[in-house]
Amino acid sequence: MIHTLLRWVFQRLYRIRIEGDSSQFQQSKLLITPNHVSFLDGVLLALFLPIKPVFAVYSSISDRWFMRWLKPYIDFVPLDPTKPLAIKGLIKVIERGQPVVVFPEGRISVTGSLMKVYSGAAFVAAKSGATIIPVRIDGIELSPFGRLAGVFKRRCLPQVTITYLPPTTLPMPEASSARARRALAGERLHQIMMKARMETRPQHTLYQAFLAARSRYGRHSASIADISFNEDSYQGLLKKSLGVSRILQRFTRADEHVGMLLPNATITAASILGASLRNRIPAMLNYTAGAKGLQSAMKAAGIKTIVTSRQFLEKGKLTDLPKQVSEANWVYLEDLKDTVTLKDKLWILFHLLFPARAMLPQKPDDAAIVLFTSGSEGNPKGVVHSHDSLLANVEQIRTVADFTPGDRFMSALPLFHAFGLTVGLLTPLITGARVFLYPSPLHYRIVPELVYDQNCTVLFGTSTFLGNYARFAHPYDFARLRYVVAGAEKLSETTRQVWQDKFGIRILEGYGVTECAPVVAINVPMATKIHSVGLLLPEMESRLITVPGITRGGRLQLRGPNIMKGYLRVENPGVLETPAAENAEGELQQGWYDTGDIVELDERGFCTIIGRVKRFAKLAGEMVSLESVEQLAVKVSPEAQHAASAKSDSSKGEALVLFTTDSQITRDVLLAQARSSGVPELAVPRDIRYVKALPLLGSGKPDFVTLRQMAEEPNSEQSVIEPSIVKQPITNASEPSA
């Protein structure tokens, strides 16, 4: 009677929604592993699970007065965390055929993300051979019974969803000791729970996800700022997005790829959202690529209209671009101000009140954005991502990293770069964190000052950029940083060490590719292995394909929700080439993406990058990693920059060429280091060329196409070059008034 009454009351108060197959609970041995987000989780499960389970409760809780009241209605087993043998009692309960509920996190989440997962629950599952049913509880964390005060906007009676995920098992892992087996089992249960979170994520478009964040964190919550130092709330960003969308639709049509040539600024974020909500597909153009690069991108993606700013072109010394790319219809944001009519203003006002009505019909799987590869190995390709692939990557990041509305992101990587777009814009917007957009990662003195001034807690960049920030930063500039993430190139040991010594900060290395939106793997405080790029993100499948001549690792292929829809190539304009890769048997399989990277995966799943397939040289039949050549040079001269390439050789097929900014490096010095490091003499280049600076792409990565061309040239003074990267100005695009 009491059970029925309470169930009715909770159903009315919280509008409980049950999802999933309830018949799967009819198992002989069952372990239920829910996430833990509020003090009501146990009560909700006791009332709404289709079975009557036994709850594992810490003795510190089971001895409380309120548990005596609940004992007649809820079966529970006291669990003393100070006595490891106590979990044997749970195993006996399961073996008797009684279903058991264990909260693997052991405590209520204070971040909104998964907390640490204890290995006890995993050991129980593995030892008993029980079927695991993950359960997700969503919504109740927003109530006063959650522990997210100051993190999320509180609601008295939020809607609650309880989701039953498909059953799984957890065999006892093989390891050298019982302690290691238990630890591995705990890690695998953590992966099961992360997968459960991914499977229950909302299916939204970019604009819908933005509106959901606006509702969740409060429309007047500060969300974004730029070099103008004017901070916009979610409502302010919505207003600008509606203004851009209203005017942009005059120059474009639905489903059109619209070029965006804009700096890191609030108006760029508004332009992306504004185009997206009216079913236009932003194509993020690289303003460091020059006229030829823009024309290649336009041809590949069928771009006819380019949205930009006169102020940006002027300060960036790019005013000749419109003349050089005259085939495009150039739309200047400054010119839009005078075209806003009373009808436009009324339309914007109406949709500020009813923002969901502004969006044209779209599906999460529809194309959302076009990014372009860096072109480090050839012509840039257009990479088409859906709303779902971008938001899946954001959710993968949120699942492993505890970003909250209390965080502040410093975003200096360009938004035309996948790393800058997803991690530097979409993740903070969806997470409720504030983001400061800065137009250039190359201002090595200014960026640290802004990190300090804006109280930033999250910074990301390439190894090169982070190393230069460390050179010019005051030791206190980075005092508030809690996440510093390096990606896009291998993290140098020098950069890692200087951050540790000067700031006491551990850089977390990650790995990503544009085709994966882009994050694939990342080290986080909960799971870190030095010299690796971390664990693959949840919901990502991987396989390694053997490459002839390469003995370490294999060619990494990936499949998951964050994989692109396909390529747009200059050679086949406007035609979407869906991802596909050959498996070990040579069969072409759709949905798999071949990264072209040689990696190793250890028994825990940590990923170590060996190099790219295209960055191996074949010398007299032997495969030599160009990255290993660069690492050899780094050991000899850690302060300089080095890049290895290959050139044609009539006797060996190929020969190594080392480009370095250290004029004192000689082959004898490299040979001595190679002998002490156990590196074969074959990997020591004979052709060593001094350059003032390496040619770089807009992302900060070395321009290997240019380096290969230079390698084929005779070793002369012509190889002394300046960087090819465009020096980006401190500028902020003008905004149309709405």
Swiss-Prot record:
GO terms for molecular function: acyl-[acyl-carrier-protein]-phospholipid O-acyltransferase activity; ATP binding; long-chain fatty acid [acyl-carrier-protein] ligase activity; medium-chain fatty acid-CoA ligase activity. Disulfide bonds: none annotated. Keywords: Acyltransferase, ATP-binding, Cell inner membrane, Cell membrane, Ligase, Membrane, Multifunctional enzyme, Nucleotide-binding, Transferase, Transmembrane, Transmembrane helix. Its EC number is 2.3.1.40, 6.2.1.20. It is a multi-pass membrane protein. GO terms for cellular component: plasma membrane. Pfam families: Acyltransferase, AMP-binding. InterPro entries: Aas, AMP-bd_C_sf, AMP-binding_CS, AMP-dep_synth/lig_dom, ANL_N_sf, Plipid/glycerol_acylTrfase. Residues 15-138 are annotated as: Acyltransferase. The active site is at residue 36. The keyword Transferase applies. Signal peptide: none annotated. In the N-terminal section; belongs to the 2-acyl-GPE acetyltransferase family. Plays a role in lysophospholipid acylation. Transfers fatty acids to the 1-position via an enzyme-bound acyl-ACP intermediate in the presence of ATP and magnesium. Its physiological function is to regenerate phosphatidylethanolamine from 2-acyl-glycero-3-phosphoethanolamine (2-acyl-GPE) formed by transacylation reactions or degradation by phospholipase A1. This is Bifunctional protein Aas. It comes from Pectobacterium atrosepticum (strain SCRI 1043 / ATCC BAA-672) (Erwinia carotovora subsp. atroseptica).
